[in-house]
């Protein structure tokens, strides 16, 4: 029985990155032998065990065989005679198909180290085409390693395009798409995930509402960066730069889907794109089976983001309407993710990548002022039922009116 470190631990060590977790492949063992040695079985689809002391995952070397369309259509074979090279051959990218033995000797049958040095994301074998999830994983790794200069190898992109044309991504279940999309959105350069998916043709199949934004013109005065798709990509990276939550990043991805619905005669302005985009944001969220918090914030940011950008010009009653629309008085934890998404939207424009956004500070202060209003005092005055609600709202409006407002600066009307 021989153990080998594999995959991300080997790759990240060679890149000089921190190694967060170590996975192992075991050659020449059986499940019975692993359990006899104290390993705890945890794998459902194939033999995976946890080390009795370290808790690190140890998988028996295995091969895979395609049996049907989609990522579920695989048959696995794990046995003592399966070699390390056979196990590595089933992996997606060459940089993930390296191993080290117990002495630290590198085992690299597919040129992963060369591709690391050349900053290439390249498939190991044409078996890559058997699993459409690998297109999503490729895009996710492109987002992770973009700052290191990694690019997708031409032949790998061509293979992905053929997979999409063959309908492979159409067989992906929503939960798997969401899992990879969510992980990609949390990478340092999430725009690269969307760019790779778009180049492969997969974005149009998985997120047609986002794909439709590319080529949609915007007002040059507000969006010198170009079309609505480019703005969305820039906003995603701006969200990553402020360490926004997954909920906020997903909301940024969808916040402008209404711009693809703007009538041609209105272009390049997009009046009413917030309301127009609500159904699209809700549809994407439900199709992907995104978590409720992600779904809710995506819809709310889509609907209300222009109110946030115009906050310094809004009447106090409209500011309170914004807070009510976000349901902040019952869900105050929504404020920061909402503001992060709107900040990213503001910075996702040419020349504003590091700009201040005074509207955010004003909205925080205004909401705190509103929270200082208590219904109890009005009840003690003898008000009842709807009278209490009306009095509370009026008091909140007065509180907002007392909050100092910095200079509004350049408006974003219709942006």
From Swiss-Prot:
Protein name: Multifunctional CCA protein
Family matches, as InterPro entries: CCA_bact, HD_domain, NT_sf, PolA_pol_head_dom, PolyA_RNA-bd, tRNA_CCA-adding_enzyme
Cofactor note: Magnesium is required for nucleotidyltransferase activity.
Gene that encodes it: cca
Catalytic reaction(s) noted: a tRNA precursor + 2 CTP + ATP = a tRNA with a 3' CCA end + 3 diphosphate; a tRNA with a 3' CCA end + 2 CTP + ATP = a tRNA with a 3' CCACCA end + 3 diphosphate
Domain commentary: Comprises two domains: an N-terminal domain containing the nucleotidyltransferase activity and a C-terminal HD domain associated with both phosphodiesterase and phosphatase activities.
Assembly and oligomerization: Monomer. Can also form homodimers and oligomers.
Cross-referenced NCBIfam families: PRK10885.1
PROSITE patterns: HD
Positions contributing to Mg(2+) binding: 21, 23
Record key words, sorted: ATP-binding, Hydrolase, Magnesium, Metal-binding, Multifunctional enzyme, Nickel, Nucleotide-binding, Nucleotidyltransferase, RNA repair, RNA-binding, Transferase, tRNA processing
Domain of life per record: Bacteria
EC number(s) from the headed UniProt entry: 2.7.7.72, 3.1.3.-, 3.1.4.-
Family matches, as Pfam families: HD (PF01966), PolyA_pol (PF01743), PolyA_pol_RNAbd (PF12627)
Domain HD: 228-329
HAMAP family xrefs: CCA_bact_type1, CCA_bact_type2
GO molecular function, a single term: ATP binding
Organism whose genome encodes this protein: Halorhodospira halophila (strain DSM 244 / SL1)
Note: A single active site specifically recognizes both ATP and CTP and is responsible for their addition.
Family recorded in the similarity comment: Belongs to the tRNA nucleotidyltransferase/poly(A) polymerase family. Bacterial CCA-adding enzyme type 1 subfamily.
Protein task: Catalyzes the addition and repair of the essential 3'-terminal CCA sequence in tRNAs without using a nucleic acid template. Adds these three nucleotides in the order of C, C, and A to the tRNA nucleotide-73, using CTP and ATP as substrates and producing inorganic pyrophosphate. tRNA 3'-terminal CCA addition is required both for tRNA processing and repair. Also involved in tRNA surveillance by mediating tandem CCA addition to generate a CCACCA at the 3' terminus of unstable tRNAs. While stable tRNAs receive only 3'-terminal CCA, unstable tRNAs are marked with CCACCA and rapidly degraded.
Residues annotated as binding CTP: 8, 11, 91, 137, 140
Annotated binding of ATP, by residue: 8, 11, 91, 137, 140
Cofactor(s) named in the record: Mg(2+); Ni(2+)
GO BP: any one term: RNA repair
């Amino acid at each position: 029985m021989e153990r080998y470190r594999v995959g991300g631990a080997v790759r990240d060590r060679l890149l000089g990155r921190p190694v967060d977790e170590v996975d192992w492949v075991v050659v020449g063992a059986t499940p019975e032998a692993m359990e006899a040695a104290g390993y705890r079985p945890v794998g459902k689809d194939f033999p995976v065990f946890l080390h009795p002391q370290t808790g690190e995952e140890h998988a028996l070397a295995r091969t895979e065989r395609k049996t049907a369309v989609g990522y579920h259509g695989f048959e696995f074979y794990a046995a003592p005679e399966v070699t390390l090279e056979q196990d590595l051959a089933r992996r997606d990218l060459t940089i993930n198909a390296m191993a080290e033995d117990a002495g630290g000797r590198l085992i690299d049958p597919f040129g992963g180290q060369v591709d690391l040095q050349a900053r290439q994301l390249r498939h190991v074998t044409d078996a890559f085409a058997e699993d459409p999830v690998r297109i999503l994983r490729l895009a996710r790794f492109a987002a992770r390693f973009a700052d290191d200069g990694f690019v997708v190898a031409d032949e790998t992109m061509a293979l992905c395009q053929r997979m999409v044309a063959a309908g492979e991504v159409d067989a992906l279940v929503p939960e798997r798409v969401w899992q990879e999309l969510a992980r990609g959105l949390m990478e340092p350069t999430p725009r690269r995930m969307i760019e790779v998916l778009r180049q492969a043709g997969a974005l149009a199949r998985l997120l047609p509402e986002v794909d439709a934004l590319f080529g949609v013109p915007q007002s040059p005065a507000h969006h010198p960066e170009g079309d609505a798709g480019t703005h969305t990509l820039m906003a995603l990276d701006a969200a990553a730069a402020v360490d926004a939550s997954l909920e906020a990043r997903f909301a940024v991805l969808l916040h402008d889907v209404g711009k693809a619905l703007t009538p041609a005669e209105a272009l390049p302005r997009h009046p009413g794109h917030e309301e127009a985009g609500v159904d699209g944001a809700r549809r994407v969220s439900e199709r992907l089976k995104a978590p409720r918090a992600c779904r809710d914030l995506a819809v709310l940011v889509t609907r209300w983001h222009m109110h946030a950008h115009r906050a310094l010009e809004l009447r106090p009653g409209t500011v309170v309407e914004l807070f009510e629309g976000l349901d902040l008085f019952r869900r105050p934890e929504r404020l920061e993710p909402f503001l992060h998404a709107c900040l990213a939207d503001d910075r996702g424009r040419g020349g504003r990548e590091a700009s201040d956004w005074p509207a955010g500070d004003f909205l925080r202060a205004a909401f705190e002022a509103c929270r200082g209003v208590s219904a109890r005092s009005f009840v003690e005055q003898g008000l009842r039922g709807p009278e209490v609600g009306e009095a509370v709202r009026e008091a909140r409006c007065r509180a907002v009116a007392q909050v100092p407002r910095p200079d509004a600066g350049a408006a974003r009307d219709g942006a």
